[in-house]
């Protein structure tokens, strides 16, 4: 828990316990003789170790009963101004990564609210002068995904306005509806990327494996739920006109107290 106090022996004990084949996840990708490869893995690697039960279950964080506020400082050069140099972020925990619909739905909402042309959250914050650069982040590579709205080049005293603008904008979207073209564009964009499976310079097998871990690490019976995403994309297309996305905003962004306001200010 306190890295500077970690002794060398405790470090070795931790490594022996958790960096052991019994606590590993092994997958094979490609056209191969599976029996031959598994035999090789056993003979050259796994047979050198005894199977040892390792309790490495990742537990859910207890939900907050109210939003938490965190203030931290970061260093700037002596000649830099503290004005317009604060970072503000509004963060909410969004279910778990084992919910394949939420896993993708908030990818779509991140696009529609913060990245699409005329994205309402981004526009509202910029129009209010709360920061000079607004971005969104949706991290669904962890057990409890986090949706964030981030304002750069803001000021500490704008925190209340930052929260007010976000929540007022979201309430208006729930009441009057989200831009359906933006939702469809977001779904089409993410579905195209999924079908294309173009990972640039990264090996496809590696990237597929990393996607497996988004669910496999937390439920060993569900390694492939995010690899079988076409039915989920079809479901999301059907929900565009039903109020489904507005209900998600109400439940996970407005009514949800499991979140934080983080202020990173210069010193």
Model-derived segments and their meaning:
Residues 1-63, 83-105, 111-267:
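Charge-rich, well-structured scaffold segments of protease-associated domains
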Residues 67-77, 194-198:
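Short, low-order "capping/linker" segments at domain edges
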């Amino acid at each position: 828990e306190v890295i500077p106090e970690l002794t060398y022996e405790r470090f070795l004990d931790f490594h022996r316990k958790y960096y052991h084949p019994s606590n590993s996840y092994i997958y094979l990708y490609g056209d191969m003789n599976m029996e031959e490869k598994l035999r090789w893995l056993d003979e050259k690697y796994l047979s050198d170790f005894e199977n040892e039960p390792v309790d490495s279950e990742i537990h859910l964080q207890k939900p907050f009963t109210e939003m938490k506020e965190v203030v931290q400082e970061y260093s700037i050069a002596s000649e830099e101004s503290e004005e317009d140099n604060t970072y503000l972020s509004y963060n909410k925990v969004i279910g778990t990564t084992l919910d394949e619909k939420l896993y993708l739905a908030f990818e779509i909402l991140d696009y529609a609210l913060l990245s699409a042309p005329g994205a309402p959250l981004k526009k509202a914050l910029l129009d209010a002068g709360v920061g000079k650069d607004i971005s969104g982040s949706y991290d669904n590579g962890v057990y409890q995904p986090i949706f964030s709205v981030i304002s750069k080049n803001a000021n500490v005293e704008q925190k209340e306005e930052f929260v007010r603008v976000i929540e007022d904008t979201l309430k208006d979207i729930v009441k009057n509806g989200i831009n359906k073209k933006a939702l469809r564009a977001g779904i089409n964009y993410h579905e195209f990327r999924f079908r294309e499976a173009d990972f640039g310079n990264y090996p496809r097998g590696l990237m597929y494996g990393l996607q497996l871990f988004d669910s496999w690490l937390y439920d060993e019976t569900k390694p492939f739920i995010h690899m079988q995403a076409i039915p989920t994309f079809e479901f999301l297309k059907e929900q565009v006109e039903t109020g489904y996305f507005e209900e998600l905003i109400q439940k996970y962004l407005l009514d949800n107290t499991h979140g934080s306001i983080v202020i990173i200010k210069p010193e």
